[in-house]
């Protein structure tokens, strides 16, 4: 019995090691792709670093889950005893990709959860890092920042804060909700503007990083 359990544990460890290696290889592949092939590849290293300082990560807008690779790499590498990931998107990811990401998370000992939902209609959860890459409009990001920021302990990271959606709203999309409060200026456009206005309202947050490459990537830090 003892020998059987030892062999079983060894088999599980071998499988976990293989998945850990595969996660690293998949991350490296996407992180090395040029902007023409991957619109967030150049920022995976930032997500990895920020997640490396976090116990709980929330991702709003998972898309093809490439960004999730960076977050899982960081969670896997940190020394925290608690490691949790929550992804939220209006669309269900490709089943094969989602299953593979889930396996990667399990091998990294990350408590993994995906929710199919409108992020403006769910209750925010406390987290160390919030990453946002959803509908690229001023009003959408403004509402997300106001709703989720009170629950964020350390960092808020956002993609697409430079060209083309830094100063323009993404066209051809129906607003997720029409219940916009009166204090949102209906003439404002773009994610950069949404970030700047959020910072003006919330002195408890400061801009830590602003990268202009690969459509832009901005990091806010709680002070």
Roles of regions detected by a PLM:
Residues 10-12:
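Boundary at the C-terminal end of the N-terminal hydrophobic targeting segment
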Residues 17-223:
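S-adenosylmethionine/decaboxylated-SAM
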């Amino acid at each position: 019995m003892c020998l059987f359990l030892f062999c079983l544990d060894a088999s599980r460890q071998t499988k976990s090691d293989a998945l850990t290696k595969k996660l690293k290889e998949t991350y490296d592949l996407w992180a090395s792709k040029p902007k023409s092939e991957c619109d967030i590849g150049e920022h995976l290293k930032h997500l990895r670093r920020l997640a490396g300082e976090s116990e709980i990560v929330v991702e709003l807008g998972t898309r093809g889950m490439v960004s999730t690779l960076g977050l899982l790499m960081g969670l896997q590498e940190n020394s925290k005893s608690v490691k949790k990931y929550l992804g939220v998107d209006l669309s269900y990811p490709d089943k094969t990709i989602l299953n593979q990401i889930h396996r990667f998370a399990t091998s990294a000992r990350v408590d993994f959860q995906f929710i199919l939902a409108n992020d403006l209609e769910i209750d925010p959860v406390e987290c160390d890092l919030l990453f946002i890459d959803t509908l690229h409009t001023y009003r959408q990001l403004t509402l997300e920042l106001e709703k989720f920021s009170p629950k964020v302990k350390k960092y808020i990271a956002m993609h697409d804060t430079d060209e083309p959606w830094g100063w323009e709203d993404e066209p051809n999309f129906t607003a997720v909700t029409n219940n916009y409060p009166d204090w949102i200026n209906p003439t404002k456009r773009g994610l950069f503007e949404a970030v700047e206005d959020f910072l003006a309202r919330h002195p408890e947050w400061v801009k830590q990083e602003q990268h202009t490459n690969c459509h832009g990537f901005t990091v806010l830090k709680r002070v």
